[in-house]
Amino acid sequence: MNSGIDLQGSFIETLQSFGLSHEIAKTIWLPLPLLLMIIGATVGVLVVVWLERKISAAAQQRVGPEYAGPLGVLQPVADGLKLVFKEDVVPAKTDPWLFTLGPALVVIPVFLSYLIVPFGQNLVITDLNVGIFLWISLSSIAPIGLLMSGYSSNNKYALLGGLRAAAQSISYEIPLALAVLAIAMMSNSLSTIDIVEQQSGYGILGWNIWRQPVGFLIFWIAALAECERLPFDLPEAEEELVAGYQTEYAGMKFGLFYVGSYVNLVLSALIVSILYLGGWEFPIPLDKLAGWLNVAPSTPWLQVITASLGIIMTLVKTYALVFIAVLLRWTLPRVRIDQLLNFGWKFLLPVALVNLLLTAALKLAFPIAFGG
């Protein structure tokens, strides 16, 4: 295993070469990861919104956005600015505190989840021993915000949408957690860094998707349900509930629900790429690349190049999954609420339990292949 990418050390070393002290250089570094996380997540959402509009247009043989910037790339920015400048209307009979707090509870946990997402061996803000379960626990907060928004709106459609969101989240959170447990069992860790490292050394053949194909499908289906993507968008079904829990919202509060939804979609695709598709792993290890170039692995410019390749690999896998999610929106019809709950409790949960037991048995029988 190579020593990995020490971006922090390279950054501090570069600043020290310009005459700054170690303490000042470290102080400059401290806010950068958090700032980069917020900017990166925001840019990622803008890209996904544009991609969804263009892919949806192609699926329906339309042109899609084309006037706001080249190929319509500024359309998501225009949509955001429009919502920012719209009036924030609060209906008279709502609970104003819960009505305002609901959208915040939807967005904040999703952004916090990016703290444990690695784009490289040391390209992560917080490498926690229970990182992947932190994501699961944070994702379970969002339905509380949706239920709070629906209840406080004093609207029957909004309340039904909030109740559906809570029921849907509870139904699919358990199979998702069981799929993660199978991966943690093979990796002997809940750290996202350790899970990616466990898949390294064998190129594409080392990815967990080959050892956990059923777990991959369970996780991906449950993640789409958590993101409320078609065919699981029951909480905001327009034909049945007007706009669900969003019915009484306007302006930026209305926009926050969509921000949370798209940020969660990108986050879910990132988690899938980390758990099952090798994360940032590049076919050429850092040590071998350094040997070919006849330089030390700790060389700052080599660290930057390797970090960039890791980020590119992670994003390619992530946006490939987002592309699949967008295509599914225009391929599958919406299910009924009873079908949704029956599928989660009567099919997905038993299959997830069997997959976990099978993984445990294979780990004992083939410890080398399954992380014994």
From Swiss-Prot:
Membrane spanning residue stretches: 28-48, 97-117, 130-150, 176-196, 204-224, 265-285, 308-328, 351-371
GO cellular component terms given for this protein: plasma membrane-derived thylakoid membrane
Keyword Translocase annotated: yes
Signal peptide: none
A Pfam family of this chain: NADHdh
Top-level EC class: translocase
GO molecular function terms noted in the UniProt entry: NADH dehydrogenase activity; oxidoreductase activity, acting on NAD(P)H, quinone or similar compound as acceptor; quinone binding
Subcellular location: Cellular thylakoid membrane
GO biological process: aerobic respiration; photosynthesis, light reaction
Recorded catalytic activity of this chain's protein: a plastoquinone + NADH + (n+1) H(+)(in) = a plastoquinol + NAD(+) + n H(+)(out); a plastoquinone + NADPH + (n+1) H(+)(in) = a plastoquinol + NADP(+) + n H(+)(out)
Transport among keywords: no
Keywords attached to this entry: Membrane, NAD, NADP, Plastoquinone, Quinone, Thylakoid, Translocase, Transmembrane, Transmembrane helix
Purpose of the protein: NDH-1 shuttles electrons from an unknown electron donor, via FMN and iron-sulfur (Fe-S) centers, to quinones in the respiratory and/or the photosynthetic chain. The immediate electron acceptor for the enzyme in this species is believed to be plastoquinone. Couples the redox reaction to proton translocation, and thus conserves the redox energy in a proton gradient.
Quaternary structure and interacting proteins, as annotated: NDH-1 is composed of at least 11 different subunits.
Protein name, per record: NAD(P)H-quinone oxidoreductase subunit 1
Gene it is expressed from: ndhA
